[in-house]
């Protein structure tokens, strides 16, 4: 685990974005942890979050021409990533996002920002079922652009209905990489490093969950 990944986990815990306990997911599974990127909800938190996204993207070394933020959660994520790429890496990247409902007046259409062209890096928080990414792929194909990859905050490393995770299915179906700032393995490593009975208890619960549902 790299220092920025450890810093990100600490940051997510501080912001109450990453919590440990018992959480019932939409799938009905009872998870020992919960990750809610919507709680990165202040200027300072978003600025810091953008730096983590930008660092992950630069580390991955995947070529891209434009950032795409899927409505709604992906919009602030793509925006703060674009700002951080310029401020901290001197990379000036165009970005674009979609509206859920197309406008019929003014600038019109369902896309806002830079032209959706070339190699597109999709920015989102997590991939749970892959449904949102499939919708984005349709938008990219319609624009005759190419998917470069997906950048997310957390890879849960968890099976879907079959043997693969939603991320593995996206990589298989669309032939593009999914980059994550951290994975569940990184969270487990972080918990193991802490000298705390409480964190040790959480680690045991996460290990058991990973054995049952992990890939």
Curated annotation (Swiss-Prot):
Q: Keywords assigned by UniProt? A: Glycosyltransferase, Magnesium, Pyrimidine biosynthesis, Transferase
Bilayer-spanning residue ranges? none
Output the Gene Ontology terms for molecular function.
Answer: magnesium ion binding; orotate phosphoribosyltransferase activity
Q: Where does orotate bind?
A: 34-35, 128, 156
Question: Which residues are recorded as binding 5-phospho-alpha-D-ribose 1-diphosphate?
Answer: 26, 72-73, 99-100, 103, 105, 124-132
Q: Which domain of life is it from?
A: Bacteria
Task: Give the pathway.
Answer: Pyrimidine metabolism; UMP biosynthesis via de novo pathway; UMP from orotate: step 1/2
Please list the cofactors this protein needs. Mg(2+)
- What does the UniProt function comment say about this protein? Catalyzes the transfer of a ribosyl phosphate group from 5-phosphoribose 1-diphosphate to orotate, leading to the formation of orotidine monophosphate (OMP).
Checking PANTHER family in the record gives: OROTATE PHOSPHORIBOSYLTRANSFERASE 1-RELATED
**NCBIfam families linked to this entry:** pyrE
Record's protein name: Orotate phosphoribosyltransferase
The protein's organism comes out as: Marinomonas sp. (strain MWYL1)
């Amino acid at each position: 685990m790299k220092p920025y990944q450890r810093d990100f986990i600490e940051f997510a815990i501080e912001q109450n974005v990453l919590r440990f306990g018992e959480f019932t997911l939409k799938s009905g599974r009872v998870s020992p942890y919960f990750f809610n990127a919507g709680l990165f909800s202040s200027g300072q938190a978003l600025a810091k979050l953008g730096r983590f996204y930008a660092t992950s993207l630069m580390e991955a070394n995947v070529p891209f021409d434009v950032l795409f933020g899927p409505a709604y959660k992906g919009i602030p994520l793509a925006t703060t990533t674009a700002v951080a790429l310029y401020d901290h890496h001197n990379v000036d990247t165009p970005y674009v996002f979609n509206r859920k409902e197309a406008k019929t007046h003014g600038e019109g259409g369902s896309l806002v920002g830079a032209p959706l062209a070339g190699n597109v890096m999709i920015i989102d928080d997590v991939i749970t079922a892959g449904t949102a990414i499939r919708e984005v792929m349709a938008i990219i194909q319609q624009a005759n652009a190419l998917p470069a990859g997906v950048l997310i905050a957390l890879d849960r490393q968890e099976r879907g209905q079959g043997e693969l995770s939603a991320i593995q299915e996206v990589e298989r179906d669309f032939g593009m990489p999914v980059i994550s700032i951290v994975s569940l393995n990184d969270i487990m490593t972080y918990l193991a490093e802490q000298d705390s009975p409480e964190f040790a208890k959480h680690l045991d619960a996460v290990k058991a969950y990973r054995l049952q549902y992990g890939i």
